[in-house]
């Protein structure tokens, strides 16, 4: 084996979160490769190409077709899976990337209402590309993980190689269909089962809340600001004082818990709404930093699910006046 050198493969490295992971990893001295359907380097929303982009190996590949990227895996010490969709086949991503507010609102409204056939051919095409929850959120991750575990490293590592899956906090239902979080949790279960059977690998599940960036995703910023305000208000309310989130949790506790099927993976939608009111959003750079720490060969202690508080603990972020309510790495 060759001398150890940290190198990560980012699945979806030219996307919003994937590009932040690439940039952060380079800043930490790692080598970076990316695969995406287009294979094109990342550009800013205005079409600019920052200097760091030229340091990334950009490859065209399909996560569901291992033959398009399997040759890259022996050289990497960690794989980061960043692709997924919040609304299946809605076309919201292209509208968000283009900054097209009317089309974004229309796409999200259609997805929440149950979809339908759009009269706009561009919107129909973007829907086709964005795919289903099962395909993007679960199947691509499982296929990449399977292929990674089957690869033989050509670099010497001091510990298990890491597979990092971008999952999510359950704080979007029922606005976001339950299929989103269900397929995320299904992917975690399937990946964990594979990794548990192979001591040479470890899996980390990063569970962010709403991810924002004021410049790259300006349409999300107002919502992020409101949710952050809500979380702050809830965290500072007097003990015993009723809050909207508290009422929602009470209602959720009165609902029977599902005992079979995919719904057994999640709790009541009332609890999900309560979390969105109490758990603040997170900057994309903070998520990327947590991912890169998890990918570091020296952090073999980083395993399992990381919710927002655990992510903050991992990156050394401490909220003033509050103690962390969750130990890093504890299930959420």
Predicted feature locations:
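NAD(P)H-binding glycine-rich loop region in Rossmannoid oxidoreductase-like domains
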Residues: 41-143, 147
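Conserved beta-loop-beta element that borders a ligand/cofactor-binding pocket
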Residues: 157-167, 189-219, 238
């Amino acid at each position: 084996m060759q001398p150890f050198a940290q190198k990560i493969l980012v699945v979806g490295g030219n996307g919003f979160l994937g590009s932040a992971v690439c940039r952060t990893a380079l800043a930490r001295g790692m080598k970076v490769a990316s695969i995406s359907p287009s294979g094109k380097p990342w550009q800013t929303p205005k079409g600019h190409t920052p200097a760091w982009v030229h340091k990334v190996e950009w490859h065209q590949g399909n996560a569901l077709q291992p033959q398009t990227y399997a040759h890259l895996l022996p050289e990497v010490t960690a794989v980061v899976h960043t692709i997924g969709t919040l609304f299946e086949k809605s076309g919201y991503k292209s509208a968000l990337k283009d900054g097209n507010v009317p089309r974004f609102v229309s796409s999200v409204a259609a997805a929440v209402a149950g979809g339908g056939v759009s009269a706009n051919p561009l919107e129909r095409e973007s829907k086709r590309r964005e795919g289903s929850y099962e395909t993007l959120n679960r199947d691509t991750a499982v296929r990449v993980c399977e292929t990674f575990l089957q690869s033989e490293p050509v670099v010497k590592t001091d510990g298990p190689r890491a597979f990092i899956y971008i999952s999510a906090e359950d704080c979007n239902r029922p606005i976001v269909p339950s299929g989103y979080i269900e397929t995320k949790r299904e992917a975690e279960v399937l990946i964990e089962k594979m990794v548990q059977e192979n001591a040479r690998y470890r899996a980390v599940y990063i569970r962010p809340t709403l991810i924002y960036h004021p410049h790259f995703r300006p349409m999300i910023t107002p919502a992020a600001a409101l949710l952050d305000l809500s979380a702050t208000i809830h965290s500072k309310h007097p003990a015993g004082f009723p809050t909207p989130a508290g009422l929602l949790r009470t209602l959720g506790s009165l609902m029977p818990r599902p005992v079979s099927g995919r719904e057994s993976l999640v709790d009541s939608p009332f609890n999900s709404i309560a979390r969105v009111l109490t758990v603040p959003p997170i900057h994309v750079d903070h998520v990327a930093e947590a991912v890169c720490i998890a990918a570091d060969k020296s952090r073999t202690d980083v395993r399992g699910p990381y919710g927002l508080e655990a992510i903050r603990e991992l990156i050394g972020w401490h909220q003033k006046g509050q103690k962390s309510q969750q130990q890093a790495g504890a299930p959420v």
